[in-house]
């Protein structure tokens, strides 16, 4: 059997493919201006680095291209640890910032439902307005703020009490005894301020007469913490011709954004 040589037409095609591939490699290395092209083994090194500069687009944000100074620093093993220390010092504050707990700015679940308190009491010689607001701090503590304005003669007292507090006009010796529930009442006055002003004005019951009136404005801040069960608002007003004692215990199982309204 006589063997015939293969046609030479195939060889130029193979050579053309090889030249095309080599051109692609050379074109890929043209963008790497920070590499020494005259050094030996440059082609292999450039091919490896070209993969780093042109990675697969697996991330939305493109990886930053290393600066020339970074690679030159890393080439020397003596200066590598200094370079790594400098990079670490820059990245440590960012890492600490990322480790901080994220504070949610949205609404968190309150410990109880009621938030605002409003009480308006009007008589012939008295006009009393009491407003209250509770602020849940979200860390197991909450504050209760009271403000009341009264026009007339008398003393007003607004406080937080446990449910066992007896509603009565006069303080009896039995009501001062400490119970188990009152001992676990973890609420205290944090701030208190009272402003009083005296003036004369026309009487409500008889506009032809001049009456002596006293205006009182009070701000009280309570701070409560766990453990606690139920707290109540206790209002007491004493004047010459009018007495009022009221205890309001909100329902903790009912969550509502509307304020509690009390009138009398």
UniProtKB/Swiss-Prot annotation:
This is Neurexophilin-2. GO terms for cellular component: extracellular region. Keywords: Glycoprotein, Secreted, Signal. Residues 91-169 are annotated as: III. May be proteolytically processed at the boundary between the N-terminal non-conserved and the central conserved domain in neuron-like cells. One of its GO terms (molecular function) is signaling receptor binding. Glycans are attached at residues 86, 139, 149, 155. Coiled coil: none annotated. It is found in: Secreted. Belongs to the neurexophilin family. May be signaling molecules that resemble neuropeptides and that act by binding to alpha-neurexins and possibly other receptors. Residues 170-178 are annotated as: IV (linker domain). Residues 179-264 are annotated as: V (Cys-rich). It comes from the Eukaryota. Brain, only in a scattered subpopulation of neurons that probably represent inhibitory interneurons. Residues 23-90 are annotated as: II. Residues 1-22 form the signal peptide. Pfam families: Neurexophilin.
